[in-house]
Amino acid sequence: MSNQIQELLKLAEKNDADAQYELAEAYRTGSGIPENLSEALRWYRAAAELGLADAQNNLGAMYLSGMGADKNPIESVYWYKKAAELSQMHAQFNLGMLYLFGNGVEKNDTEAAYWLHAAAEQGDLEAICQLGNLYQLGRGVEQNYVAAAELHTSAAIDGHIESLDKLAEYQQSIEEAALSGSVIAALCMAQKYDHGLGTSEDAAQTYAWVQWARLHGTYDEDDNQLEEWESYVTAITSEADIERGKKLLNEMRGRADEMI
């Protein structure tokens, strides 16, 4: 046992939650001490009972997977919820998924959406994607393809493959919503071409969709997002792309008229 581990053990035995957590990590990974999942579980629990959210999350994970103890989804839910209520992002996601599939707790789409939203707000890409799926399907939330598109666009920009696939899956619905006046959908289209999501980057298309949002969109939320995009495309779009964007804008008007 290394000197560092010995010091951690002394502090852990004095109810130092951080030391208990670090000791549990060492036992779980075999870092500086032989791997011992039972001891890892023991020290995670000690830190969890002192209110350390990261320890509560890891304890939930160990009970869910059966590491250091028999699998116990109910106990897993208990500790994930403790951590989630302390705003531990991974616990919020994990708890949301347990509610979604009814693992260790009664299946509840509304609770699933609540906790996935909490994790998504903190930037968890998988939570953003799964929340987008719930909006697409209308599970736990009112079905809203535009909200789904906004979430999947956000995750896809950061490289989430499933979200990129989802955008391709209902591309037509997003475009139709944009042409019908949804500013959010139009900005999703702009981001698609700005970031090259499933297509080539195209500054003219980006410009055209932002202008469409400004000229034809019905915006019932904060205007800041649209203003930021207008400033962005004005600053970076070349004269040639602006001219091409204006032609694309006329084509969009034609497609919108055909939908009436």
Regions found by a protein language model. Give the residues of each.
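Short helix-capping/linker turns of helical repeat alpha-solenoids
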Residues: 13-16, 29-31, 36, 49-52, ...
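Amphipathic alpha-helical protein-interaction segments enriched in hydrophobic
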Residues: 184-188, 206
